Swiss-Prot record:
Cell membrane keyword on record: yes
One Pfam family recorded for the sequence: YidD
InterPro entries, alphabetized: Membr_insert_effic_factor_YidD
Species assigned in the record: Histophilus somni (strain 2336)
Coiled coil: none
Annotated membrane topology: Peripheral membrane protein
GO CC annotations, alphabetized: plasma membrane
Family: Belongs to the UPF0161 family.
Keywords: Cell inner membrane, Cell membrane, Membrane
Role: Could be involved in insertion of integral membrane proteins into the membrane.
Protein name in the entry: Putative membrane protein insertion efficiency factor
PANTHER family, alphabetized: MEMBRANE PROTEIN INSERTION EFFICIENCY FACTOR-RELATED (PTHR33383:SF1)
Intracellular or extracellular location(s): Cell inner membrane
Length: 86
């Protein structure tokens, strides 16, 4: 089931998609992680929204460098801190 995303989320996801289609093919595969940083960014924004998703993506991109071995690094799940269920 497709969920509705905010305008900001759609813009950010669109920018990442443009990067994937136009820039990434020119520079080649460089990401050390699975999923790639751009896929991670899309998943993070869809899961956590624009603010937290952007923050998670920036942290991930800063980890993606030659001195980090990389590997499997999924988007953390959204934790529901709803106190009404207690």
């Amino acid at each position: 089931m497709e969920t509705s995303h905010s305008f900001g989320a759609k813009v950010l996801i669109g920018a990442i998609r443009i990067y994937q289609l136009m820039i990434s093919p020119l520079i080649g595969p460089r990401c050390r992680f699975v999923p790639t940083c751009s896929c991670y960014g899309i998943q993070a924004v869809k899961t956590h929204g624009v603010v937290k998703g952007s923050w998670l993506t920036v942290k991930r991109i800063l980890k993606c460098h030659p001195f980090n071995v990389g590997g499997y690094d999924p988007v953390p799940p959204k934790i529901n801190n709803n106190k009404e269920n207690e």
